[in-house]
């Protein structure tokens, strides 16, 4: 509280959540001065220890705060928030676990768990700018699910039958089913993108990241 009062007294722009705080100034010189003053105040007046490994002077692009990173929007002439690269990597890792082909659960259960992950992640990062990221992650999730579905179909005969049900020509379905290539390669082919497309996966119950983000986004 006293740290907050000090920032207000000195007319410093700051954001604070629990014991995490960002103080914003216009120059590196000002930043170093504020860093010294705040650190001295915390240690000498409050009797607390400042963790210097987590405290630093940096530009907005170099910050990670509560899972967010920052970038400069040249059109809006201001800095904006987005999910930090480490947060994105953590999401991708969890998504990969939920779409593991060797995980012995049904694909509908995988979709259920994916939806929980997607909704929770976007609900948290909804103030960030991430339309392009959501589209990229959407495509990745669909690709991973195609591999799960292709493996579930197992036999060439079953794959031909299911591809034809999804509107694929019989000859193309036969060639695809008997291609002998690895699952990862088959599921990158155009025929698979057509057969198991975004609309069909949504019908199967999958939440589209870009659609959900567009509904939730407060800055769009």
PLM feature segments, named:
Residues 1-8:
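Short, small-residue-biased leader/transition segments that mark boundaries at the very start
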Residues 110-156, 160-164:
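Non-catalytic, peripheral interaction segments enriched in hydrophobic/basic residues
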Residues 144, 149, 153-220:
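Extended C-terminal regions of large enzymes
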